Amino acid sequence: MRYSVIASKYVKALLIVGQKLNKIEKYGEFLSFVKNIYESFATFFNNPIVKPEQKTLVIKQAFEEVFKESPGEAFLNFINIVFENKREKFIPQMQALYKYAAIDIENKILVNVKTAVKLSDQEIKVINDFVEKYVGKTPVIEETIDESLIAGAVIEFAGKMIDVSIKGRMDKIAKEVFFLRKG
């Protein structure tokens, strides 16, 4: 997915505010919630007849209904500016960019783990310890289930890929056999 320059500028602004208010992680959760609301009610939020204040009010009411609290004036102002400037179509991009920028700014590292079955807490801890020792940053694990791996895992972080899956082993063996037959 190509991210727009517009979305990245909004994300940068929200990160600055989040850092000052010590709410980087909370704003990430809030932005994810706003993205879900936006995608569910895109017709309403993309309607030019609906005023930005009304859109912001709907977001605020949804927060109060789900979280039993307001997201705060700073976050609501951010959302209102997004609507005033007619940038709501960038909300999904903002959410994705924010997630990765927040991980970076907090000196963490994203670790993509693909497994055939859900990892146990102990397995996650082993991966966390390994990655932290390897790169010196706190890992943020994103787990994906891919039954085609049969067993094992594919771990990606810091530009590295470690494939310890059965499928990976079988592919490697198949390539070796293929090259032996060719030669």
Curated annotation (Swiss-Prot):
Name of the protein in its database record: ATP synthase subunit delta
Major localization class: membrane
Recorded topology in the membrane: Peripheral membrane protein
Subcellular location field: Cell inner membrane
Annotated family: Belongs to the ATPase delta chain family.
InterPro entries, per the entry: ATP_synth_OSCP/delta_N_sf, ATPase_OSCP/dsu
HAMAP family found in the cross-reference section: ATP_synth_delta_bact
Endpoints of the signal sequence: none
Family matches, as Gene3D superfamilies: N-terminal domain of the delta subunit of the F1F0-ATP synthase (1.10.520.20)
Chain's role: F(1)F(0) ATP synthase produces ATP from ADP in the presence of a proton or sodium gradient. F-type ATPases consist of two structural domains, F(1) containing the extramembraneous catalytic core and F(0) containing the membrane proton channel, linked together by a central stalk and a peripheral stalk. During catalysis, ATP synthesis in the catalytic domain of F(1) is coupled via a rotary mechanism of the central stalk subunits to proton translocation. This protein is part of the stalk that links CF(0) to CF(1). It either transmits conformational changes from CF(0) to CF(1) or is implicated in proton conduction.
Molecular function GO labels: proton-transporting ATP synthase activity, rotational mechanism
Keyword Heme: no
Classification via PANTHER family: ATP SYNTHASE DELTA CHAIN (PTHR11910)
Quaternary structure and partners: F-type ATPases have 2 components, F(1) - the catalytic core - and F(0) - the membrane proton channel. F(1) has five subunits: alpha(3), beta(3), gamma(1), delta(1), epsilon(1). F(0) has three main subunits: a(1), b(2) and c(10-14). The alpha and beta chains form an alternating ring which encloses part of the gamma chain. F(1) is attached to F(0) by a central stalk formed by the gamma and epsilon chains, while a peripheral stalk is formed by the delta and b chains.
Highest rank taxon of the organism: Bacteria
Key words, A-Z: ATP synthesis, Cell inner membrane, Cell membrane, CF(1), Hydrogen ion transport, Ion transport, Membrane, Transport
GO cellular component: plasma membrane; proton-transporting ATP synthase complex
